Design a protein with these regions (language model features):
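Extracytoplasmic
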Residues: 1-145
Length: 145
């Protein structure tokens, strides 16, 4: 995957559910959800603490990435996107602290410097924040050199 081209977050989103047993309702397992925005199309929504997206075989090249940029929307401050290589606790590239944008469908591009992203790796976008409330919505992301 080319991280220097715009990557739509929802094209790699996953969600799952599990059933506890026959006579009880479904319980949702951790995962991301999608919805349609009138302004930008499909997005990853209702992101909560410890949800994550994994992207396989991201080729950062020899010179590597210097910056991560994401198109986000949020009514509140307090969410973040932690960037890691190869596993949930792998090498840390950087963390984008998501600032309030004015609403769940008010979109802004926000960015953060990154380091250590060279070669080909699996990339983890791990969402962080306090409590169980939704943190922000994510439309697309990209890296720059």
């Amino acid at each position: 995957l080319d991280p220097y081209a715009r990557v739509e977050a929802e094209t790699i989103a996953w969600t799952s559910r599990i059933k506890r047993d026959r006579d009880r309702p479904f319980q949702w397992a951790p995962g991301v959800k999608t919805t349609r925005s009138d302004k930008v199309g499909m997005v990853v929504t209702r992101i909560t603490d410890l949800d994550y997206i994994k992207v396989n075989r991201v080729d950062f090249g020899r010179s590597g990435a210097k910056r991560f940029k994401a198109n986000v929307a949020s009514e509140t401050d307090g969410g973040a996107i932690e960037l890691r290589l190869d596993s949930l606790d792998g090498p840390h590239l950087g963390t984008l602290t998501v600032s309030k944008t004015g609403g769940w469908d008010e979109w802004q591009q926000q960015s953060v410097p990154v380091s250590g992203a060279t070669g080909t790796h699996d990339l983890y976008l791990i969402f962080r924040g306090a409590g169980d409330a939704p943190l922000f919505n994510l439309d697309h992301w990209t890296f720059s050199r």
